Amino acid sequence: MAKVCIAAYVYGVVQGVGFRYSTQRQALALGVTGYARNCDDGSVEVVAYGEQQAVEQLMEWIKQGGPRGARVDRLLTEPYPATPFETFKIRY
């Protein structure tokens, strides 16, 4: 199956609620690599690389609201240059 890389920008109540760490756990469980980081505007940027189906499952999990305590109001995605990452990290 083809590998894809997606950049996602997640808006809503997504900082201070464990969103990045929960996204990391979900991504690793799906075999997806990349990173999540807080942005200055209150959003979270997620870059996900892996099998298309696994990346789509991660995006669907994010759309559904992510972890308890988070609220996703908007999710924007765009293609990202295919970058094989070693693992899924939290960036600061």
Swiss-Prot record:
Keywords: Hydrolase. One of its GO terms (molecular function) is acylphosphatase activity. Gene3D superfamilies: 3.30.70.100. It catalyses: an acyl phosphate + H2O = a carboxylate + phosphate + H(+). The keyword Hydrolase applies. The active site is at R20, N38. InterPro entries: Acylphosphatase, Acylphosphatase-like_dom, Acylphosphatase-like_dom_sf, Acylphosphatase_bac, Acylphosphatase_CS. The keyword Hydrolase applies. It comes from the Bacteria. Its EC number is 3.6.1.7. Residues 5-92 form the Acylphosphatase-like domain. Belongs to the acylphosphatase family. This is Acylphosphatase. The lineage of its organism: Bacteria, Pseudomonadati, Pseudomonadota, Gammaproteobacteria, Enterobacterales. The gene is acyP.
